[in-house]
Each structure stands twice: as C-alpha cells, then as structure tokens.
Amino acid sequence: MAKPLSERFFIPHEIKVMGRWSTEDVEVRDPSLKPYINLEPRLLPHTHGRHAKKHFGKANVHIVERLINKIMRSGGSHYKVAGHFMRREHRSLNSKKVKAYEVVKEAFKIIEKRTGKNPIQVLVWAIENAAPREDTTSVMFGGIRYHVAVDISPMRRLDVALRNIALGASAKCYRTKMSFAEALAEEIILAANKDPKSYAYSKKLEIERIAESSR
C-alpha cells in the first residue's frame, strides 16, 4: 500500500518567499495600489515571462519579482542621476535573473537585520511612499504646447516607484565600495521611512510639486 503524500514528500505548512519571508501578514494601506501589488504565497518569484504579452499582465506578477525585473534593466539613455547614467554601472545584471535574485535576497536579509521587520512589508511601505499621485503631460491648444497636471493610474504609480527605487540604489553605490545589495536595502528603508535622503521618495515629491504648479 502506497504511503500518504505527507510521508513521501515534505509539504510545508506555509509557503514563504525565497523560503524565508511570509506574505500572510503583509498589509497594503493604499487602496488604489492594493489590487496591483501581488502578494500571493510563492517560494520562487519567477513566472518565466508568461504574463509578458497579456494586457495588464504585470498585475499578476509577484511584487518581489517585479523588483527583481527592475534592477535587471540597464535603463534608457534618459535615465540620468546627478549627471551620470547610474544604471549602466550594473550591466552585469542585465537579463541575468539569478544574479538579480541573489541581490534582492541579500538586500532583504540586510533590511530584516536593520529593522527587525518583514522586508516584504518594508518594501510595500517604500512603494506606497514612493508612488506619485500626480504627474504632468503636454497638450496643444492653438499651436501652443501647455503642461497640465493629470492623475496617474495605479499601475503606472507602481512602475514609477519600483523604477525609482532601482535607480536610487544604483546612485548610492555608484563609484563607491557599497555593494548593490546594501544600496538597495538602504534605499528601501529610507523610502519606507519617508526620508528625503531616499531618491525614490524625493523624486515623488518633485513630480507632485511640478504637477501642482501646472494646475
């Protein structure tokens, strides 16, 4: 007679991200971002790009995987911080998900050690604080171009926050002895605490200030 599955295989009672951190108690306070921050229990945050060609498919990608994907990108030529193309320092991560995964995992360990809290919860707080609510767009009336303030969709708010967190981490370790994992952990902690030293949080304030002046 065959043995039950519980005796033949190890079945965990709780699935933890990267085998270390649970998402059960992670809370999203921003109601507009909540439907788009995927916190499903997942051991390995890697979907193999199965949502790439689906409309709004990114909403089904785990939030940790979306962060990993952001730090893998080198960015376009217009991504400039303090006059430098910061993300070009980390071309070794381009399309190398295993390396990017290890960087994020190490950053999460640093966050847990420094704050004593679940790093996924700290990441969610950082995203909420770094997601701008308003931006500007250009419209043309009578051959004259004007900048007007517009609301940002929740999906774009999330994208902008993650992009700026990745950019801020690259800026912090640019030409320094600080590792990318340490810089990423510091940027997430600063953004979660609404510290103006955070590039992502200060960028959000700048975007909203420009939008307010364009009303």
Curated annotation (Swiss-Prot):
- Biological process according to GO: translation
Query: Where is it found, in Gene Ontology cellular component terms?
Result: small ribosomal subunit
SUPFAM superfamilies in the record, alphabetically?
A: Ribosomal protein S7 (SSF47973)
Record bears the keyword DNA-binding:
no
Instruction: Tell me the superkingdom of the source.
Output: Archaea
InterPro entries found in the cross-reference section = Ribosomal_uS7, Ribosomal_uS7_arc, Ribosomal_uS7_dom, Ribosomal_uS7_dom_sf, Ribosomal_uS7_euk/arc
Q: Which UniProt keywords apply?
A: Ribonucleoprotein, Ribosomal protein, RNA-binding, rRNA-binding
Molecular function in Gene Ontology: rRNA binding; structural constituent of ribosome
Q: What Pfam families does UniProt report for this protein, alphabetically?
A: Ribosomal_S7
Family according to the record:
Belongs to the universal ribosomal protein uS7 family.
HAMAP family per the UniProt record, alphabetical: Ribosomal_uS7_A
Q: Give the protein's function.
A: One of the primary rRNA binding proteins, it binds directly to 16S rRNA where it nucleates assembly of the head domain of the 30S subunit. Is located at the subunit interface close to the decoding center.
Query: Assembly and interactions?
Result: Part of the 30S ribosomal subunit.
What's the protein called, per UniProt?
A: Small ribosomal subunit protein uS7
| Species this chain originates from | Pyrococcus abyssi (strain GE5 / Orsay)
| Chain's gene name | rps7
